[in-house]
C-alpha cells in the first residue's frame, strides 16, 4: 500500500489540475454515479497521510489508493493504459489544444462531499507526518496513549499518526534498534517518532526510497 510520501508525490504531479475547468466527469461508483462536476473549477489538490483530496468549487473528491489504486494522466481521446472497467473516476479538464484526462483506476476508497465537511471527515486521523507544520506533540500524545500496545502496531495506526505504512514502520524500528513487538511503554517514543518523520521527509520528493546512508546522514538521525 502506498505510504504518505507516495501520496504526496502523486499530489505534486496533479498540481496542474488547479485552476482548470472540468469539461467532463464520470464517477463509476454506484453511490456517486449521479455526481457531475462538469463546469466546476479545480481549486486545489492535496494529500493528508495516505489520503488524496481534490476540491472542485465547494465539492471535495476524497480518495485512497489502498493496495492497487493508481491515477493516470493523458490527453483526452488517447488509449488508456489500463482496462476501462477498472476506472472509478474519470475527469476531463480544459486544456489547449486537447483536454487532459485524469483517471483513477482501482481506487480503494471514494467519497464525495461538501467542502465544509472536510475537517469532520478527517477528524479521526492523527497528525499528517509530512505536513510541514505537523503537530508532533499531538502525535506523541496519541502514540503514548496506549502504553501496552506494540510499537509497530501503534506506528501503523492512522489514528495515531497519518502516513506511516509498513515499510517506514519497519525501517524506523530498525534504525531505533527496537523490535516492532516491543510495548510502547518500553520505547523512546519521541526518538522513534522523530526517526519516522525524518526518513519520510528525506524521501518526500524522491522516486527511490533511501532509509540509510548519505542522504539521511545529512538530517542527523
What function would you assign to each model-found segment?
Residues 1-219:
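Structured catalytic/nucleic-acid-binding cores of DNA maintenance enzymes
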